[in-house]
Amino acid sequence: MNLRALAAKAIFDVLEKGVSLSVALPEQQKHLASGKDKALLAELCYGVMRTLPQIEKRTAECLAKPLKGKQRIIHQLLIVGCYQLYFTRIPSHAAISETAEACRQLKFEGMVKVVNGVLRNIQRQLTPLSNESETLSYNTPGWLIKRLKTAYPGNWQEIIQQSHERPPMWLRNNRLSQSRDEYLAALDKLEIDASAGLSDDAILLAAPKDVATLPLFLEGAASVQDGAAQWAATLLAPQANELILDACAAPGGKSCHLLELEPSIKLIAVDFDAKRLERVQQNLDRLSLKAEVIHGDAANIDSWWQGEQFDRILLDAPCSATGVIRRHPDIKWLRKNHDIEELAELQRQILDHCWKWLKPGGTLLYATCSILPQENRDQISAFLARTADAKLDTLVQQASSQDIGWQITPGQHNMDGFYYARLLKATH
């Protein structure tokens, strides 16, 4: 099937059915043989998600009436066409003819003239895209802009801008295979430009690469993991032979990093999502690491764990993922304002429950890939107020010792947006 038709189908699944792009895109990429075509399909889908309000408005201006019902797929096809005309180097005639052909392949023969007409109209007048509202100016939903303005009055615009940048590719060196310097030297030998990141195992690539081209990647010499996420294992600081729980473990990057740091630990990796849990096992297998992988609910540990309390717990809590919009731009359209309070309540339940399963004297690291205070600073502040045996351990990375935890904003040191708070349980 024509590449533009596949793009329209993936975007339809995201915007009309609420499927995440990380699921919808690979589903359509299966139909393409060449890596080049798969990359173009990804560029079209991600590009549309980044610029959706502006290109939807521009497309609507050239339509006599909105497309509804079964014709929504053609609406998605038109915005794919509009994106090509404004944001890619694809020659206009090719973009238009290929998009019209996609309309045929989607079995809407009667709409081909409409698609042709709308796209030719746009091409004739490539006027600047509308910025008459903040949603249009920033290609971001109004509710999220409002929350960011409140949380970051001095730099909310920069945070939004960083969230639209194309994300860099980070690697985590597997210290059980080689030192970071040795892996950097191996990359250099292959003329792959890379530099050391802030945390001990982090490597930042100057340009994204296919993992199959990286030295000994498939044999477990390194993993793909953003620089911000790599702090989790370092901050939890596993010690020899400890019993450690990774409470929301999928897809398993942090579990694997914990085992790389301290192979003698007994690690229990748990997740509520059975499908994503398969990825945890795949990652462990590639890196030749061992953990007990359990399908279970971190808010109901009693139902799947009859062992003793844990020495350390990593709680990478379910969250809005507002810190990783640059990697997952569909989050802007899948998340809704009311989700934030619902997520904060879920986080509260999981945090309180995990705390009961932490040994006296133990450490719990609370983490999210959110940049919203309701899920981070406010969440931990409320937890400390209601939990007598909990104490916040100041992290050296914090901007100030008065801060509650460490908030990383998108693009800071080239990292994703992330939050960490390290909590210590009293010994008495």
UniProtKB/Swiss-Prot annotation:
Family according to the record: Belongs to the class I-like SAM-binding methyltransferase superfamily. RsmB/NOP family.
InterPro entries associated with the record: MeTrfase_RsmB-F_NOP2_cat (IPR049560), MeTrfase_RsmB-F_NOP2_dom (IPR001678), NusB-like_sf (IPR035926), NusB_RsmB_TIM44 (IPR006027), RCMT (IPR023267), rRNA_ssu_MeTfrase_B (IPR004573), RsmB-like_ferredoxin (IPR054728), RsmB/NOL1/NOP2-like_CS (IPR018314)
PROSITE patterns: NOL1_NOP2_SUN (PS01153), SAM_MT_RSMB_NOP (PS51686)
GO terms of biological process kind: regulation of DNA-templated transcription; rRNA base methylation
Protein name: Ribosomal RNA small subunit methyltransferase B
Known catalytic reactions: cytidine(967) in 16S rRNA + S-adenosyl-L-methionine = 5-methylcytidine(967) in 16S rRNA + S-adenosyl-L-homocysteine + H(+)
Catalytic residues in the record: C369 (nucleophile)
Molecular function terms, GO-annotated: RNA binding; rRNA (cytosine-C5-)-methyltransferase activity
Subcellular location: Cytoplasm
GO cellular component: cytosol
Keyword hit for rRNA processing: yes
